[in-house]
Curated annotation (Swiss-Prot):
Pathway: Amino-acid biosynthesis; L-lysine biosynthesis via DAP pathway; (S)-tetrahydrodipicolinate from L-aspartate: step 4/4. It is found in: Cytoplasm. This is 4-hydroxy-tetrahydrodipicolinate reductase. It comes from the Bacteria. GO terms for biological process: diaminopimelate biosynthetic process; lysine biosynthetic process via diaminopimelate. It is an enzyme of class 1 (oxidoreductase). NADP(+) binds at residue 38. Its EC number is 1.17.1.8. Keywords: Amino-acid biosynthesis, Cytoplasm, Diaminopimelate biosynthesis, Lysine biosynthesis, NAD, NADP, Oxidoreductase. NCBIfam families: dapB. GO terms for molecular function: 4-hydroxy-tetrahydrodipicolinate reductase; NAD binding; NADP binding; oxidoreductase activity, acting on CH or CH2 groups, NAD or NADP as acceptor. HAMAP family: DapB. Gene3D superfamilies: Dihydrodipicolinate Reductase, domain 2, NAD(P)-binding Rossmann-like Domain.
Amino acid sequence: MSDLPGIVVTGASGRMGQMLMKTVLASGKARLVGAVERPGSDWVGRDAGAAMGGAAIGVTVTDDPLAAFAQAQAVIDFTAPEATVQFAELAAQARAVHVIGTTGLEPVHLERLAWAAHHAVIVRAGNMSLGVNLLTRLTQKVAEALDEDWDIEVVEAHHRMKVDAPSGTALMLGEAAARGRGVDLAQARVSGRDGITGPRAPGSIGFSAIRGGDIVGEHDVIFAAAGERITLRHVATDRAIFARGALKAALWGQDKRPGQYDMMDVLGL
């Protein structure tokens, strides 16, 4: 077992953090060697397995990420933008693969990730599932095939606790549509229409977000023309799909050169 890659999970106490730890522990392909939480968390100092309500696993939750990363070959990180860029710099120091599922990253954060990627492998994606990445590729292909008479709308739905909108996955799909059309999403994007908006701008790519209940994640890409429409859809019913994809990315990155990669690279799409 000791020759298996060691994985550290950040944001250990969160729903995704716990799912990631359980996925690593059950995989038989990697070892969970660390769990990181913010200073002041009541998880710090506890055994990660016991903190999740199970048996002890011999991994103590820490608030010292660099010490944890130094013992690992990969870090899996679904936290928040400011935390993620700090983790990226520390993972680069430790030369650990950094798998990032954090959404809501702004250009200032991406600049810091680009620096870290000079020294370590970073795999970042708005969504780690195979199905969504296939949907992304299909979205680009359909957008390439259809002209501007077909309007493009991205509609996403998530649980009530999600703090950013549109979702990272929705933006990933929008970027794919924009690439297919040969346009810049920043110029084509229209989000959250309200009030008297006037006619739809030709060539625009619209985004709508729904928040409620415990919806894991639903994404529709709608291509609408006069008299017909095409809807490409993905529904996630279990966030374990994201954890499995993240672990796949962590293992894939072990023999890669420093740089920035995404799930398309991991999946060979």
